[in-house]
């Protein structure tokens, strides 16, 4: 889909096509990094923004994003590519399946000594539009959290009739 979007932009909007190629390249580079590597919350949010900018080309105004971020947490440590798959799931299983689109809400807050990240998206009204998937991204995130934090971190999925919510909790640490 992304490559088709780029191809369609090359003649009409070459600067935008170039930007999408750069965004996609940065996402590819990030995906090649060792999965146990720590980065900052700010860097993870940057990858989410790159991904959402690419999806915005495909979905246009159907994709709305609401960022609710505690700026004091931006320099906290976070495993590389732990948040972007949650945002991707929200777009793929939620927004893209709804003809009129919807809003992805991304929240970042602190609860005691924990970072709490929430990602919410609307649920398609038609049962035929719901794509359950294989939960590979969620299983991968749970395994990584367990390996890095043992029982101090959690991924909580709350499917609802109207809203699908995912909450990621992990210890707040500074990047060493």
Question: Language model features by range: what are they?
Answer:
Residues 1-158, 163-169:
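Two-component histidine phosphotransfer core
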Residues 171-176:
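C-terminal end segment of the histidine kinase catalytic
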């Amino acid at each position: 889909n992304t490559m088709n979007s780029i191809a369609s932009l090359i003649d009409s909007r070459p600067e935008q096509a170039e930007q999408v190629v750069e965004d996609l390249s940065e996402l590819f580079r990030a995906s090649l990094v060792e999965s146990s590597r720590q980065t900052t919350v700010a860097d993870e949010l940057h990858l989410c923004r790159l991904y959402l900018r690419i999806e915005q080309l495909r979905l246009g105004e159907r994709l709305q994003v609401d960022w609710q971020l505690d700026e004091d947490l931006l320099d906290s440590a976070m495993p590389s590519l732990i948040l972007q798959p949650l945002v991707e799931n929200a777009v793929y299983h939620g927004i893209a399946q709804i003809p009129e689109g919807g809003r992805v809400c991304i929240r970042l807050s602190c609860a005691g000594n924990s970072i709490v990240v929430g990602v919410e998206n609307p649920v398609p009204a038609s049962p035929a539009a719901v794509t359950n998937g294989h939960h590979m991204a969620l299983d991968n995130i749970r395994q990584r959290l367990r390996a890095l934090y043992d029982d101090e971190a959690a991924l909580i999925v709350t499917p609802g009739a109207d809203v699908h919510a995912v909450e990621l909790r992990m210890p707040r640490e500074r990047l060493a």
